[in-house]
Amino acid sequence: MSSIPLHLVTGFLGSGKTTFLKNYLEEFSGSRKIGIIQNEFSNVNVDSFELQQNKSGFEILEVNNGSVFCVCLLGSSVDSLDSFINQVQPDELVMEASGMSDPLSIGQILQSPKLKHKVYLDHVWCLVDAVNFKKITRLQTRVNHQIRIADTLIINKTDLAEDENDELVYLIKKLNPFAGIQLATFARVSFDLNKPVMKLWPSKENVENGRPDLESQVIKSNRLISANNLNEFLKVIQSGCIRSKGYINLTSGAKVLLQGIFDQFTLQEVEKFVAPTEFVVIGSFPEAQSYQKLFDNCCSK
């Protein structure tokens, strides 16, 4: 089985993720077999019932209680997803994350032995509620984190906040200047994945012999790293790296957003990021190579 692309759909509660999924299915489910993974935080999954009313060309795996993104249930989530892929054999996967989820945790799932050769993260969509964004972003730092790692940001419900749309675009660009931004009503957008400034993956046409054999490693640390040592770390990983993204705390006190495609890396200082270092590196790695250990060693120099 070829490696399957996974599209991750994030956004706070009520931002329009399920409506976006409906639109996505209307666009593509007639031409490809789509596996839908819903990561609901409640015990009863209402959204999957809503989606199934228009079922055509897709299957649903209900993952309740936020289990896909919960480290304590990581094993069972991997088994469920692996079984789902084997049974359904979809052309692609679309995961709707719960509104309370931290999207980077998906990297821990995809790097599991059962999945790392079957699934790769293709694109991260984040829906932003134009009406309630200012209230939510003050209360939930996780919302800002969802915005920061997105490839495409969809500012939804713009018809209900017309006077604030320009300001919202400005505020969101401050959080993530690299993502493509689309203004939408009822989550209707263009699905042209070539529009984002920093697309998560190279286009299929640029990959020889089909999709690459890719893995992902999530690096986490409570320690600080100097700018010089970080540059040395990036030089080491660049040969096997296709995509890197996340946040790093420096010894200078600065917090930087790492964005990388192949051997090209950018580091941008960010404000209001209060969390340990956490970033994902995706690519083809030598066996048993641990970027976590390498990063830890660079922190201790």
At which residue positions do the language-model features occur?
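Alpha-helical segments flanking ligand/cofactor-binding loops in enzyme cores
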Residues: 26, 144-145
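Flexible loop/N-cap segments at domain edges
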Residues: 281
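Nucleotide-state-sensitive switch-loop elements of NTP-binding domains
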Residues: 2-10, 15-136
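C-terminal accessory "lid"/substrate-recognition subdomains
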Residues: 2, 43, 145-275, 285-289, ...
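Charged helix-capping and loop-helix junction motifs
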Residues: 138-141
